[in-house]
């Protein structure tokens, strides 16, 4: 039997249905009137599913073409038609070459996906009946769905340009297969304006900086198509060889990012529309729907982390395919071991981790037993509080307890130091309150200075895991100054909703700095990172600080004293020995002293900020300086608690938890090729939301060595670690209404990604690369002098590694 082509109606078919002759009845159909009603309508039409799918996706764009990167942004729409599946809302094209709509119906043949509506002719077609359907049949659902789609079309086309996308016919015109070359005749990436979709300046400013991130443009080429080969080399201790896996097609958000970056590099006039990318992001993070006021740093987190999740899923799928997709039931123990080993290394190869993700190490040392705990966590940016000069109000001593009076006397010796300590206390992400040695730890008395526990290895393996789940501290959001002002209550509610939405996926935390949720106060004293004496003696030029631990020698001697005071005659064999020769005690103290000094040692000389300095370096100095955990903010030391319990083993009473004074420091232990610094200008002060407008100086060339651990990966002691500024996100205005803009540096790419860190000894002679700074505010693009850049009110700073 000859099948009629969908929607290929003769002239007679365009007349009224009353005058239209009946079509030949399909012998397999039970319809009473051919072409008018269909028995599949009741099972193949689901209005609620269509509404959910259509409102959450880009209108009139083939989903499969978008996934396969067969579309480009900013171009006139092609002549092909889009058919909407009335079962699930899938939008597919009817091109002769691909027929995505037909393939969708065939893929879901068992579940009725056979009825579609054309977004061009508004005609319904049943693939099972192979006939056009009447939208006025005895089923109301079909007519209601058509009405919804027509209203949705009116909404989508009323405020948007017809120049959205077009099919890509010649990929070779803009994709250069040679790494390191630009698709145009120059190696410089041009700067184009980006259309504001409605309160999306926060998005546009970030995308301008990402489009000028050369390494991102290079590495994303690897995910542009299905079948990319990836070589995974596990650690030598696994006794496994390298494995080459074939990756499946990239996920929608990563595909949309690739298309956007390509459109930004295309030569041509006019701004670029980010609609495809923005809509895909809204699918991952619904909080950005509705075109409300938002925050650039939050946007950057959601965007990078969502792409990272997609790429991790893609890499895992490639590894499982290499092992013939084993399951928990079918795989043997050896296969499980190999899959786990390759997966552990493979997930680290996603392009987000390779470009933006670094590592920080938080070191905490108990002042009583000198047990050292370390916590390593990944970051995609470092949030730095801006130091504000404030006049501290006098505190009534009568309202303080004993510990409060001790703390007050400690801080009264130096007002300036106390003010800085207050800022330092607010800058810490980790509270000393009830910090336990559940953290991955190294202990001089148990494992030796170089032994790392298995818990630490787990922390390093599980990317995106830190001490807590991701949480952003930015309260409220900002938008264009031409937009309507939002009240403080709305901003507060927006921040509250963010906390619940942040659980949508495992997330790499930013190294955010916020105050402890406890109402207890900790006294934090900023010390030079070159001071390593466990007694924490202060600089002789300053007023001496009272000791925070008894000067009775080492930990063993303190334990001897404690045992003698308790009057315990018998000790169990698992307690530390209390009798040593003087030589053994001396050797132990020397070894411990060296280990403790190394734990708090930086890569090179520490940075010393000048008086009243407010710069990126002074903020980093504050972030990485040593602080004391004491008073009501002491450390809950499990090591001391265990020792107390062993000493009281013969007693029926359970030893109380031991809280001790401690030292804590956060240092960078692994640097990514691109370091993003977030200046915390927005925060909550009491019941109010406020913005810090103080200018922060930032260098064009930043040396991060003073803020890196001495054990920082791939770096030698005493080296300079230079990073060059290439992008800024600026916020102007207030909390109620403001505007985001970008400054980007157009420059020649330094080198290919595989050449990074392969050279050494050339850091001293490095200088910032030459280039032209460009100011971009949505569609406004203009070149600016360097002086204007340095005077901007920076919110996000993008630095790239220099060799």
Curated annotation (Swiss-Prot):
The keyword Coiled coil does not apply. Retina. Residues 1-34, 394-554 are annotated as: Disordered. Zn(2+) 2 binds at residues 62, 65, 93, 100. Residues 502-531 have a biased composition (Low complexity). Zn(2+) 3 binds at residues 85, 88, 104, 113. GO terms for biological process: cell migration; neural retina development; photoreceptor cell maintenance; protein deubiquitination; proteolysis. GO terms for molecular function: cysteine-type deubiquitinase activity; zinc ion binding. Zn(2+) 1 binds at residues 38, 40, 126, 129. Residues 403-417 have a biased composition (Basic and acidic residues). Pfam families: UCH, zf-UBP. Its main location: other. It is found in: Photoreceptor inner segment; Cytoplasm; Nucleus. The active site is at 201 (nucleophile), 739 (proton acceptor). Residues 192-802 form the USP domain. One of its GO terms (cellular component) is nucleus. A zinc finger (UBP-type) spans 36-153. Catalyzes the deubiquitination of SPDL1. Plays a role in the repair of UV-induced DNA damage via deubiquitination of ERCC1, promoting its recruitment to DNA damage sites. May be involved in the maintenance of photoreceptor function. May play a role in normal retinal development. Belongs to the peptidase C19 family. This is Ubiquitin carboxyl-terminal hydrolase 45. It comes from Danio rerio.
